[in-house]
Amino acid sequence: MEDDSLYLGGEWQFNHFSKLTSSRPDAAFAEIQRTSLPEKSPLSCETRVDLCDDLAPVARQLAPREKPPLSSRRPAAVGAGLQNMGNTCYVNASLQCLTYKPPLANYMLFREHSQTCHRHKGCMLCTMQAHITRALHIPGHVIQPSQALAAGFHRGKQEDAHEFLMFTVDAMRKACLPGHKQVDRHSKDTTLIHQIFGGYWRSQIKCLHCHGISDTFDPYLDIALDIQAAQSVQQALEQLVKPEELNGENAYHCGVCLQRAPASKTLTLHNSAKVLILVLKRFPDVTGNKIAKNVQYPECLDMQPYMSQQNTGPLVYVLYAVLVHAGWSCHNGHYSSYVKAQEGQWYKMDDAEVTASSITSVLSQQAYVLFYIQKSEWERHSESVSRGREPRALGVEDTDRRATQGELKRDHPCLQAPELDEHLVERATQESTLDHWKFLQEQNKTKPEFNVRRVEGTVPPDVLVIHQSKYKCRMKNHHPEQQSSLLNLSSTTPTDQESMNTGTLASLRGRTRRSKGKNKHSKRALLVCQ
C-alpha cells in the first residue's frame, strides 16, 4: 500500500494522507508513540472499526505545498564532518542520519519554514534547517553543531543516540504546530514530520466465540525490534506481527457477545511511513548489558508481509543510513554512522572524519538504528538532484576519497559556529528539556492492550533520581585526545541542583559511552545513592 510521493513533478505532495474512520463518531487515534507527547484516545479496543480510504476532515492542513526552486535542492555529494565537543558523538551520529534523509533535507534546503516561523528563538525546525543547509553546502570542512540542537538534552555526559534522535524529531514535530492547544489531533497528523516519519499500528482482536472483530489504531514514529531471538531484521519483524492467542487467565472480554472468551490478537502495520526508523533493542534491560551479536539487515527491505492489507504488491524500502554503537556494554563505547549520499556513494561519518565506504562494509556493522526510505522516494529525490545540482567550491570528487575530513581540516580550517544567543539556549531549554519531555511522556501515554515494547524494570528504593538516564557516566581514558573539552558555556561551576534543572551544554571529557536501555516505557534514571 504505497502512498503518493512526497515529491511529484517538481511539487511537494505532503497532502495525501492514508486515513481511517470508525463506526463510532468519537473515535480517535491514541498517541502512544514513546517519542511524542501522547494524548489519551477514546477509541475502545472493544469497538468494531471499519476501514476506508478517507479520514474525517481535518481543521487545518499543516504540511507544505510549494514548489522548491532548483537552487534549493541538495547537493549530490557528502557534506561536512562534525566536531566532537566533548562526549557529543551521539549528537553527531544522529545529526548525520537526519541530514541525509532526502525528504527532510530537501524541505530544509527550501527554507520554507523559517520564512513563515514566528517563534524566531527556540524553534528546532529553524535550528535544524540552519544546520542541514550549512553541512550540505560546505563539503570538505568540519563544522561545530549549534549548541541549540542539544539544548535541554546534553548534560556534558554521553547520552543515548536513539533517545536524542527521537527527542529532536519530536521537537521538530512540535515546531510544525502553531499554537499547540488550538490544533486538533487529526491536523497534527498532517504535519511534515508525521508524514515523513509517521505511520499507524493496527491491533486486531478476533473473538473466537462470536467472531466479532475489534481494531485499534496507534501512531508510531519509530519501530523497536526485539533481537534476542532474531538473527535478522526480517525475523524480528515476523516475531513482532506474529498472532497471539488470548485464553485462560488472559482471555478476552468481548464487547460484542459480552463474554470472556478465547481470542486471537494480531499486530500489523496499517500505514507505513515514508521513512522507517528501525531500532534494534541492544540494551533491553536495566543491567546495561549489550546484545552484541550480529543481526543481518538487507539493503532492500520489503515491508509488505507486515502490512494489514496483503496482496497489494511489494512495498520496497532502501537503506540510506545506519547508526552504530561500538562497545561491549552501555557503560562505554562510541557512536558513528554510515550515510548514503544522493550520488549513491556510502560514507562513514565518525565525528570530524568522513571516509568513503562500501555497501559490503555497511551491511557488516553491529547496527543500532537503521534508516530506510521507500524506494520510489529515493529514486525521485535522486533524479531531482541530478537535474538541479548546484556547483560546489569543493566536492568529494576534488579530493582523494580515502582522505578524512580530519586531513582536509588542515587545508580548510574548521568553521567556527557563530556565537549563540544566550536567550536562544535558555528558551529552548525551558520549552523542551529532557526531563520535562520524559515526565509528560510517562504521565500522558496510554496503556493499550498491545504493548510491543514492554520491558519490566524496577528502581531500588534507596536511590534518588536526579536525571532520567539509567546509568552514571563512567569516565575512561580511552580517548585522551578529548580530555580537553571544547565546549564551555559558563565559567562558573553549577551546583548539583542547577545541573539537574538546567539543560545547558556543559563540558566533560572523553567519548566514553554511558549506559542506556532501549525500552521507553521503563524509566531511564541516573541514580545517586542517598
Curated annotation (Swiss-Prot):
Keyword Nucleus among UniProt keywords: yes
Coiled-coil parts of chain: none
Biased composition (Basic residues): 510-524
Residue ranges annotated for the USP domain, each copy included: 80-375
InterPro entries: Papain-like_cys_pep_sf (IPR038765), Peptidase_C19 (IPR050164), Peptidase_C19_UCH (IPR001394), USP_CS (IPR018200), USP_dom (IPR028889)
Segments of skewed composition (Low complexity): 484-495
Single GO biological process annotation from the record: protein deubiquitination
Cellular component GO terms, alphabetical: cytosol; endoplasmic reticulum; nucleus
Annotated spans, Disordered: 382-410, 477-530
Active site residues of this protein: C89, H334
PROSITE patterns in the cross-refs: USP_1, USP_2, USP_3
Biased composition (Polar residues): 496-505
Subcellular location: Nucleus; Endoplasmic reticulum
One family name in Pfam for this protein: UCH
Highest taxon in the source lineage: Eukaryota
Comp. bias (Basic and acidic residues): 382-392, 398-410
UniProt keyword list: Endoplasmic reticulum, Hydrolase, Nucleus, Protease, Thiol protease, Ubl conjugation pathway
Catalytic activity: Thiol-dependent hydrolysis of ester, thioester, amide, peptide and isopeptide bonds formed by the C-terminal Gly of ubiquitin (a 76-residue protein attached to proteins as an intracellular targeting signal)
EC number: 3.4.19.12
Record carries keyword Hydrolase: yes
Molecular function in Gene Ontology: cysteine-type deubiquitinase activity
Family under the similarity heading: Belongs to the peptidase C19 family. USP17 subfamily.
Described purpose of this protein according to its UniProt entry: Deubiquitinating enzyme that removes conjugated ubiquitin from specific proteins to regulate different cellular processes that may include cell proliferation, progression through the cell cycle, apoptosis, cell migration, and the cellular response to viral infection.
The protein's name in its UniProt record: Ubiquitin carboxyl-terminal hydrolase 17-like protein 10
Organism: Homo sapiens
